[in-house]
Amino acid sequence: MYCLFCQHTYTRVIDSRVSEDGATIRRRRECEACGERFSTLETIELKLPVIIKKDGGREAFDGRKLRTSFDRALQKRPVAEECIEMALRAVIHRLRMAGEREVPSIVVGEYVMAELRKLDHVGYVRFASVYRSFQDVADFREEIEKLESELLVSREQLPLLEAAMESMGHPSVDQGGKHGV
């Protein structure tokens, strides 16, 4: 790092401290040329990737567009604001953790659909109908049948899960209405 006083190209770190929230490191530095001391603050830079659109164009990630997608899909649906915020954060987290500089918009769309599927099936189908360009009622029917099939599998697995929990000494859902985990 350059010295702020003499512009010498090398300074050494003489002390480092992490902030209380753990997001910043304060470093005390000393210039090897002039001996002046100064402090720097380092923070993590978590850039979101550039989005590659279907037409090949590129644009910076826009959280407002992501929010609009969720809002449109969930319009007039009984989904708590906190749940929507958590879903938004989950999509953004997945984008950051991908570690890519560029991500195709199709990937973002799949992340959104995964979150909507957990939040609200009507919102999921709304989003999927636009995102996947449904052409007719058959496309809607096919998507709804997939959802129903997934729900059926989940319902069939619940008794198996409860039996496994009971065999490990955990009470079932029927005992007190809550999992005893």
UniProtKB/Swiss-Prot annotation:
GO BP annotations, alphabetical order: negative regulation of DNA-templated transcription
Keyword terms of this UniProt record: ATP-binding, DNA-binding, Metal-binding, Nucleotide-binding, Repressor, Transcription, Transcription regulation, Zinc, Zinc-finger
Superkingdom classification of source: Bacteria
unnamed zinc finger segments: 3-34
Keyword Metal-binding: yes
Domain ATP-cone: 49-139
GO MF term set: ATP binding; DNA binding; zinc ion binding
Cofactor note: Binds 1 zinc ion.
Cofactor(s) essential for the protein: Zn(2+)
Cysteine pairings via disulfide bonds: none
PANTHER family, per the entry: TRANSCRIPTIONAL REPRESSOR NRDR
UniProt-listed HAMAP family: NrdR
Similarity comment: family membership: Belongs to the NrdR family.
Entry function: Negatively regulates transcription of bacterial ribonucleotide reductase nrd genes and operons by binding to NrdR-boxes.
Record-linked NCBIfam families: transcriptional regulator NrdR
Protein name: Transcriptional repressor NrdR
Phylogenetic placement of the source organism: Bacteria, Pseudomonadati, Pseudomonadota, Gammaproteobacteria, Lysobacterales
